[in-house]
C-alpha cells in the first residue's frame, strides 16, 4: 500500500514539473521590446506583413525577399519605391513587393529630392566626379569628404572620387541609386545608397527607363 502511495506521489510530482515547464517555456514568436513589454507578431512567419510588424522595422538592416516573385521579376515589370521617412527601398513587380531593403538618403543640407523618376543611365563601375578623397603629393589623405567643385587639389596631389558601383542615375545633376555606406538615417550627398549585398540584384532587375518613385 505504501509502495502504491509512493508511486502516486512521484507521478504527481513529475506531472506538476512538466506542467510548470510547459507554462514557463517562452513563445518563440514573442519578442521583448525595450519598454519591457512582450510583443507577439500576429502575422505568419516569413510574410511581408510579419517582417514589417517586427519592432525593429524599419531601422533593421534585414532584407525581406519574396523568392518566388523575385524569379518572375525583370526589367519589363519592375519598379522601385524609395521611402525617405522609413529609409527603406522597395523593389516591386507591378504593385507587388518583391524586396524590402535598407537605404540611406541625403542629409538635410543635400536632401534627396522626392519625385517620380526614370532611370537615365546604368553604370556598374562608376565613381563620383564631385565627392571623394583628397590626397597630398605624398599620397596621404588630407580630406576624406572632399568636394572637387569647391576644394583645391594641392600641388602634386590628387582627387579620387567615391566609388558608386551599380549606379542608376535619376537626375542629370548627380542624384542616383548605388552601393554605398548605409546608415539608418540620412547621410549621403543626395544620392540613395543601398547595401552591397542587395544593389547588384536590384540593378539587374532594372533598365534605363524603369520607374523610381522617391516619396
Residue ranges: model-predicted function:
Residues 2-14, 18-215:
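N-terminal pre-domains immediately preceding structured catalytic cores
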Amino acid at each position: 500500500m505504501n509502495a502504491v502511495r509512493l508511486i502516486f506521489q512521484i507521478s504527481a510530482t513529475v506531472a506538476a514539473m512538466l506542467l510548470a515547464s510547459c507554462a514557463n517555456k517562452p513563445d518563440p514568436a514573442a519578442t521583448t521590446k525595450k519598454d519591457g513589454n512582450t510583443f507577439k507578431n500576429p502575422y505568419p512567419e516569413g510574410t511581408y506583413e510579419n517582417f514589417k510588424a517586427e519592432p525593429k522595422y524599419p531601422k533593421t538592416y534585414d532584407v525581406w525577399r519574396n523568392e518566388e516573385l523575385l524569379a518572375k521579376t525583370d526589367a519589363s515589370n519592375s519598379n522601385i519605391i524609395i521611402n525617405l521617412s522609413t529609409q527603406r527601398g522597395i523593389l516591386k513587380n507591378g504593385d507587388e513587393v518583391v524586396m524590402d531593403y535598407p537605404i540611406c538618403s541625403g542629409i538635410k543640407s543635400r536632401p534627396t529630392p522626392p519625385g517620380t523618376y526614370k532611370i537615365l543611365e546604368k553604370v556598374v563601375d562608376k565613381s563620383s566626379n564631385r565627392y571623394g578623397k583628397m590626397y597630398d603629393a605624398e599620397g596621404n589623405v588630407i580630406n576624406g569628404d572632399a568636394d572637387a567643385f569647391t576644394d583645391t587639389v594641392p600641388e602634386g596631389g590628387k582627387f579620387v572620387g567615391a566609388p558608386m558601383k551599380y549606379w542608376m542615375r535619376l537626375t542629370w545633376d548627380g542624384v542616383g541609386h548605388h552601393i554605398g555606406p548605409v546608415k539608418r538615417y540620412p547621410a549621403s550627398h543626395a544620392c540613395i545608397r543601398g547595401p552591397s549585398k542587395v544593389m547588384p540584384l536590384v540593378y539587374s532587375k532594372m533598365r534605363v527607363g524603369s520607374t523610381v518613385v522617391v516619396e
